[in-house]
């Protein structure tokens, strides 16, 4: 049976100072999805985040942007899943990936934290690694040749996209939303086959 998500979570940090950072690309994907379906995400204290309900491919889907800050994202997701009695396995988590080049997506059915603190928090609070993720690449230029690690990752992910990177960012966000739509319609596995090999051409550094 196809794994079709009914909850889409975009990871990021709240606050205007973080809004345009690379680390917030998960938030921006969710905003793009909400705009496509003309719905408004609203803050709900019960869920420690901004939420909306939308019909996608005829299915009711809940959107969530945790406003707990990245490192506590799991608190928000756990609250929503517990309230609606929904399984973690049907949650698709959208987040940035500093090991993937900007313009690339990678869907995974499950896995470890991959060094991402938002994913780490979800695993800790929901007590499982068994949930699909949509990783959105943010690496660009010299970053593609660097080793990712705690020492150099933080300044990069909390930095802002350059004008060159911003030139393709809208297309990247649209591609990510397309992948979400197909995941909901046909299952994450089908979307993996279609989108894991696709990329938006990178601009020249």
Curated annotation (Swiss-Prot):
<feature type="active site" description="Proton acceptor">
    <location>
        <position position="23"/>
    </location>
</feature>
<dbReference type="GO" id="GO:0006515">
    <property type="term" value="P:protein quality control for misfolded or incompletely synthesized proteins"/>
</dbReference>
<dbReference type="GO" id="GO:0005737">
    <property type="term" value="C:cytoplasm"/>
</dbReference>
<comment type="similarity">
    <text>Belongs to the PTH family.</text>
</comment>
<keyword id="KW-0378">Hydrolase</keyword>
<keyword id="KW-0820">tRNA-binding</keyword>
<feature type="binding site">
    <location>
        <position position="71"/>
    </location>
    <ligand>
        <name>tRNA</name>
    </ligand>
</feature>
<dbReference type="GO" id="GO:0004045">
    <property type="term" value="F:peptidyl-tRNA hydrolase activity"/>
</dbReference>
<feature type="site" description="Stabilizes the basic form of H active site to accept a proton">
    <location>
        <position position="96"/>
    </location>
</feature>
<comment type="subunit">
    <text>Monomer.</text>
</comment>
<protein>
    <recommendedName>
        <fullName>Peptidyl-tRNA hydrolase</fullName>
        <ecNumber>3.1.1.29</ecNumber>
    </recommendedName>
</protein>
<dbReference type="InterPro" id="IPR018171">
    <property type="entry name" value="Pept_tRNA_hydro_CS"/>
</dbReference>
<feature type="site" description="Discriminates between blocked and unblocked aminoacyl-tRNA">
    <location>
        <position position="13"/>
    </location>
</feature>
<dbReference type="GO" id="GO:0000049">
    <property type="term" value="F:tRNA binding"/>
</dbReference>
<feature type="binding site">
    <location>
        <position position="18"/>
    </location>
    <ligand>
        <name>tRNA</name>
    </ligand>
</feature>
<dbReference type="Pfam" id="PF01195">
    <property type="entry name" value="Pept_tRNA_hydro"/>
</dbReference>
<dbReference type="GO" id="GO:0072344">
    <property type="term" value="P:rescue of stalled ribosome"/>
</dbReference>
<comment type="function">
    <text>Catalyzes the release of premature peptidyl moieties from peptidyl-tRNA molecules trapped in stalled 50S ribosomal subunits, and thus maintains levels of free tRNAs and 50S ribosomes.</text>
</comment>
<keyword id="KW-0963">Cytoplasm</keyword>
<feature type="binding site">
    <location>
        <position position="117"/>
    </location>
    <ligand>
        <name>tRNA</name>
    </ligand>
</feature>
<dbReference type="InterPro" id="IPR001328">
    <property type="entry name" value="Pept_tRNA_hydro"/>
</dbReference>
<comment type="function">
    <text>Hydrolyzes ribosome-free peptidyl-tRNAs (with 1 or more amino acids incorporated), which drop off the ribosome during protein synthesis, or as a result of ribosome stalling.</text>
</comment>
<keyword id="KW-0694">RNA-binding</keyword>
<dbReference type="InterPro" id="IPR036416">
    <property type="entry name" value="Pept_tRNA_hydro_sf"/>
</dbReference>
<feature type="binding site">
    <location>
        <position position="69"/>
    </location>
    <ligand>
        <name>tRNA</name>
    </ligand>
</feature>
């Amino acid at each position: 049976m196809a794994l079709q998500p009914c909850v889409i979570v975009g990871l990021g940090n709240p606050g205007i100072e973080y809004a345009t950072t690379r680390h917030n690309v998960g938030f921006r994907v969710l905003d793009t999805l909400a705009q496509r379906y003309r719905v408004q995400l609203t803050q709900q204290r019960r869920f420690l985040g901004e939420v909306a309900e939308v019909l996608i491919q005829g299915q009711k889907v809940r959107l969530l942007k945790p406003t707990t800050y990245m490192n506590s994202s799991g608190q928000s997701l756990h609250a929503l899943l517990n309230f609606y009695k929904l399984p973690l396995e049907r949650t698709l988590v959208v987040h940035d990936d500093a090991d993937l080049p900007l313009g690339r997506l990678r869907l995974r059915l499950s896995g470890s934290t991959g060094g991402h603190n938002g994913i780490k928090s979800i695993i800790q609070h929901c007590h499982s690694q068994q949930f699909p993720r949509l990783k959105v690449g943010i690496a660009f230029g010299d970053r593609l040749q660097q080793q990712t690690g705690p020492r150099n990752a933080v300044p990069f992910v909390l930095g802002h996209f350059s004008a060159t990177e911003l030139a393709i960012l809208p297309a990247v966000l649209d591609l990510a939303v397309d992948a979400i739509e197909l995941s909901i319609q046909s299952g994450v596995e089908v979307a993996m086959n279609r989108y894991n090999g696709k990329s938006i051409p990178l601009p020249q550094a």
